[in-house]
Amino acid sequence: MKILRAAGRRVRAFVHERDARSRYLEDLGAEVVEGDLQDFDAVSAAMVGVTAAYFCYPIAPGGLLQATALFAQAASEAGVHAVVNMSQISARREAASNAARQHWIAERLLDRTALITTHLRPTFFLEWTNWAWVRRDTEGILRLPFADGRHAPIGGRDQAKVIAAILQNPDSHDRQIYPLFGAEELDYNGIADKVQHALGLPVRYEPIDIPVFAASLTARGATPFLVQHLSHVAHDYRDGIFAGMNNLVEVISGSKPMTVEEYVISTRSKFDTNGRYAVEDVLLATA
């Protein structure tokens, strides 16, 4: 949003509800429209006058495919030229995760339209480092079920730069599927070392079993749909689905992707407390 507004682009944001986040968008100069992606009339009204759209649906049960169909039809009727679709690196026909398979089908639905269409398949985000972070007085712990798998974590800001670049010049990206990676491929021991260097605090990676991870997610209030997705994604990660490197972020956006250290330094206060889905000691004791 910031990038598009700085470039002088008119931006309309379709939000589920008005809150502090939508007010922030308004402060940036965006036109904010409240609605539901399952409401065809609301989506259709929001598409009027739009030339390019970014489509992103949360990991939630039962809604992605219908929302994609409604979005595609509304965009086609309104004469939208291009769409950038947020998918995921685990999206494929044979995916065991319900969400990942639905993302693959959603890609195919959009490909059947006349819209200029680009699919983004990012690996895990740098923000995951906060998500599962366990903070103690004298150390930090990353407890995750990813064994010795590897990935090149990408920052949300870097993906935003890619999205903004494609939205402004979409034609050369038509029918492309872009796996997006960050600055450096690492295993979680390597990520822990980078976080330790940035914080000046001992940090270690503690691998856990997938059922323990799933139980912790459930205890933290995650939906069964999200638990199913992340449990199978953990298997995918171990199998190398999230691994790899390319330079697409720099080629498309013109900027090198953020490193782990740069991310940690820029979000240092978030490492002072446990992350939203931190696996607590008490759960490990009962596993």
Where are these regions (language model features)?
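Oxidoreductase cofactor-interface core, primarily capturing Rossmann-like NAD(P)-dependent enzymes
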Residues: M1-Y24, Q38-D41, A45-V50, I59-A69, ...
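Short, conserved active-site loop motifs that form the nucleotide-linked donor/cofactor pocket
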Residues: G29-E31, T117
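Cofactor-binding loops of NAD(P)H-dependent oxidoreductases
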Residues: G35
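Residues lining the SAM
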Residues: C56, M86, G254
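A hydrophobic C-terminal alpha-helical subdomain
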Residues: P211-A287
